[in-house]
């Protein structure tokens, strides 16, 4: 049975998945310090060394851009970062049918905060939803699930500065050429040690899982 085989392979590889609704539980990203994990061997052709095929580690961390309060929630849009109040102010600067007046409603609808009826309504309806945005635990408020459910949009929401980074596992450190055979992968009877020394910017507010529509 092909579907059973696929389910067994998914379980064996144990990859993290995003959620699509408020009713789903947040995926646990946790590992005790100093412990190790076993994973299946995973090698591929050079041209196949991409996010959807390469074994990696997902790092959950908090990154707050300069100028914002540490561990606070914020939005990103076109390379800029905003608190909720700043985003509302920026939103009002844009003409109807352009900029944030387009991108923010798209994000809010994807995240489940704006209903389809509100999204299809007039500009005043959308403006009202934006004006009433707040943080909280309900489905229509900004919370820990919002950024994950509303993934792949121009507007991103980082709840309490939480973000995710994916770190591809390098098999051969001596292979310096990008996409060269053996650069990435997991080979049996090998021990891999990953050390994260620094980050230069926020990751994604969603878990970078194999369904991401991006190459490395």
Language-model features, listed with the residues they occupy:
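C-terminal functional modules
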Residues: 183, 188, 210-216
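Substrate-binding/catalytic groove segments of enzymes
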Residues: 200-207
């Amino acid at each position: 049975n092909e579907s059973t085989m696929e389910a067994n392979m998914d379980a064996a590889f144990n990859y993290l998945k995003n959620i699509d609704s408020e009713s789903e539980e947040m995926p646990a990203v946790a590992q005790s310090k100093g412990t190790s994990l076993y994973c299946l061997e995973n090698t591929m052709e050079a041209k196949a060394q991409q996010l959807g095929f390469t074994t990696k580690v997902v790092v959950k961390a908090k990154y707050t851009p300069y100028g914002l309060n540490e561990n606070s929630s914020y939005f990103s849009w076109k390379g800029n970062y905003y608190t909720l109040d700043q985003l509302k102010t920026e939103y009002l600067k844009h003409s109807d049918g352009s900029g944030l007046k387009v991108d923010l409603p798209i994000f809010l609808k994807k995240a489940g905060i704006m209903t389809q009826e509100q999204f299809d309504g007039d500009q005043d309806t959308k403006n009202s939803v934006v004006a009433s945005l707040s943080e909280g635990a309900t489905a229509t408020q900004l919370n820990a699930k919002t950024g994950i459910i509303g993934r792949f949009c121009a507007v991103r929401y980082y709840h309490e500065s939480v973000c995710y980074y994916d770190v591809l596992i390098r098999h051969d450190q001596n292979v310096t050429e990008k996409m060269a055979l053996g650069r990435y992968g997991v080979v049996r009877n090998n021990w891999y040690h990953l050390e994260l020394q620094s980050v230069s910017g926020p990751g994604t507010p969603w878990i970078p899982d194999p369904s991401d529509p991006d190459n490395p």
